[in-house]
Amino acid sequence: MINNFKGILIIILSFLFLLLFKYSNADDYFPYPFFNDQSNQVILFTEINFQGEKFIYNTSMGYLELPNKFHNNVGSFISGTINVCFIKWDPFEQHQIYSRRVNKDYFSNNRFGSRIDGIYNGLCRDSIWK
């Protein structure tokens, strides 16, 4: 009986360890399992870890030049059920963000949060600004 209990406990702990490993990624790009928003929105934050001022982009906005507070200043984001393309104009760069993605630190290691100018609904490859 005790051996069965130990075996079950080992299986449960192994499963929990695998879950933690699966959702930890050095780049912090992963489907965020606790974000259940079904909206067509992307939420941008001026600071890392989803802190600071918040800006909500939705599909009806089309291409949008970000407000001054968010221009070159997106510390973290949460993507709902839409794909968006982040755009930098000079020099021209694009960064694809797929639905249900998060990044809790979009500044570190020269990430795109310190260079972003605008946001576009859709895929970067479909952008008219090539």
From Swiss-Prot:
Chief site of localization: secreted
Protein's cellular compartments: Secreted
A cellular-component GO term for this protein: extracellular region
Signal sequence extent: 1-26
Glycosylation site positions: 58
UniProt keyword terms in alphabetical order: Glycoprotein, Secreted, Signal
Superkingdom of the source species: Eukaryota
Similarity comment: family membership: Belongs to the Dictyostelium gerABC family.
The protein's name: Uncharacterized gerABC family protein DDB_G0278001
Record organism: Dictyostelium discoideum
